[in-house]
């Protein structure tokens, strides 16, 4: 979001992360592999690393739940976003989901800026930002981003429900 922030101050970010099992380490990757094999044989699975079955499933909980209903990972995303952007007043709302993908995380973002910024300007800023590649001819996927040192950004579009807002999809390892 830094290239967008350079064009117009970001007021609000709404994000849903789709985090690979590699985020839970080798044990998380092993558990996904074992559960897939067990389920394919018709066997019952018993989660150890994750709070629920991860194979063929999504779990909207990374970390532990706090009293306000958020998880520790969601609070971390909120705080890190503000810190990285050097924007103490940046409003960040996040839901973190563990998905049955071995490597590479994805994130769906909706970003609201203080001023209207054209899609062309946003796309150009993303293209010019180091370590980021704008993908316009297909949807970037975690498989494509795996073992890569860049973040792929795609599906850049205006949010039809809010002024000065854009939505985009990112994948990175």
Stretch-by-stretch model annotation:
Residues 2-125:
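Active-site-lining helix/loop region of Rossmann-like oxidoreductase modules
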Residues 91-173:
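C-terminal active-site/capping subdomain that shapes the small-molecule cofactor and substrate pocket
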């Amino acid at each position: 979001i830094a290239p967008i922030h350079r064009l117009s101050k970001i007021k609000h970010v709404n994000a849903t992360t789709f985090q690979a099992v590699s985020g839970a380490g080798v044990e998380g990757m092993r558990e996904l592999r074992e559960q897939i094999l067990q389920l394919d044989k018709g066997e019952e699975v018993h989660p150890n690393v994750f709070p629920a079955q991860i194979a063929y499933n999504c779990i909207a909980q990374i970390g532990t739940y706090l009293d306000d209903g958020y998880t520790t990972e969601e609070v971390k995303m909120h705080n890190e976003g503000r810190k990285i952007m050097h924007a103490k007043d940046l409003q960040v709302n996040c839901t973190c989901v563990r998905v049955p993908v071995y490597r590479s995380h994805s994130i769906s973002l909706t970003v609201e800026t203080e001023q209207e910024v054209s899609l062309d300007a946003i796309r150009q800023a993303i293209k010019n930002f180091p370590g980021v590649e704008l993908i316009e001819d297909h949807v970037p996927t975690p498989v494509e981003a795996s073992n890569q040192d860049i973040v792929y950004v795609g599906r850049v579009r205006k949010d039809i429900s809010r002024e000065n807002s854009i939505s985009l999809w990112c994948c990175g390892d």
